[in-house]
Regions:
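A short glycine-rich, His/Asp/Glu-containing loop-to-beta-strand
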Residues: 12-46, 53, 145-197
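Glycine- and acidic-residue-biased ligand/ion/polar-headgroup-sensing regions
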Residues: 50-80, 173-174, 185-213
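Ligand-binding loop in jelly-roll beta-barrel domains
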Residues: 87-126
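Long, compositionally biased, intrinsically disordered regions
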Residues: 3-5
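An exposed, glycine/acidic-rich loop-and-rim segment of catalytic or binding clefts
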Residues: 114-159
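Short acidic-glycine-tyrosine-enriched beta hairpin
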Residues: 45, 67-101
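Short, structured patches in soluble enzyme cores that scaffold and shape functional sites
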Residues: 101, 109-111, 118-122, 153-156, ...
Length: 213
């Protein structure tokens, strides 16, 4: 392990998209993660996925997501209306949208203060765009005792994607996550190398967490 920092603190929210971590500011080779913030009703943000697949995780608020450029739909756009709606990430299962490479996406706020997590990774295939509703999320409880937690997996093997696997984990106060200790940075018979990014939020806001690597 090098002396590089493995902790990247979230920056103050500003309107639009803010990169938190990615290849340009860390040792990551593939994954980029950031936050999209639309403070007012009617605010919009548009971007192109280019050579990457993207997953939008609606942290809170209600929004529309429009997708253009998916080859199998020609000039016809795909519109997911009034999706999300959570008060915060602790208020139920997430809503996520999978975006393939080479499309344009537009997010429009339907309520004030829409916040979206944005995960990106290189992709070779233009898989179908996909809305994953809360009722489609796989929920399971893992661990025991003080390392028990609830895991929501939205983008798993049932969603066609090249690289991204995306979900949320809810930890009771004082419990550990990612336990038992493990790693996945070496290719062996029992281990496969892949990158992993955690984005932490706490409730109440003055709470704190500790991560040991």
């Amino acid at each position: 392990m090098s002396g590089a920092s493995y902790l990247y603190k979230a920056k103050p929210l500003k309107e639009g998209y803010t990169i938190i971590v990615g290849p340009e500011n860390s040792e990551l080779r593939f994954i980029e993660f950031g936050r999209l913030y639309l403070p007012e009703v009617g605010d919009e943000y548009a971007d192109k996925t280019r050579d990457r697949e993207v997953v939008l995780t609606i942290f809170n608020g209600l929004c529309d997501v429009e997708v253009e450029g998916y080859q199998k739909r020609g000039d016809e756009s795909i519109l997911y209306q009034n999706i999300g709606g959570r008060e915060d990430v602790f208020s139920g299962r997430p809503t996520m949208v999978y975006l393939p490479r080479d499309v344009e996406c537009r997010v429009k706020a339907k309520t004030p203060g829409v916040e979206v997590g944005v995960s990106k990774a290189p992709s070779e295939n233009q898989w179908p765009p996909r809305l994953v509703k809360p009722e489609e999320v796989m929920e399971r409880t893992v661990g025991a005792w003080n390392w028990r937690r609830r895991v929501y997996t939205s983008i798993g093997e049932w969603v066609k994607a090249d690289m991204l696997l995306v979900g949320e984990t809810i930890n009771p106060p004082g419990n550990w996550s990612s336990s038992p200790p493990h790693k996945h940075d070496t290719k062996t018979d029992v281990e496969a190398p892949y990158e992993e990014v955690y984005f932490f939020t706490v409730k109440p806001p003055q709470g704190f967490g500790i991560q040991r690597i």
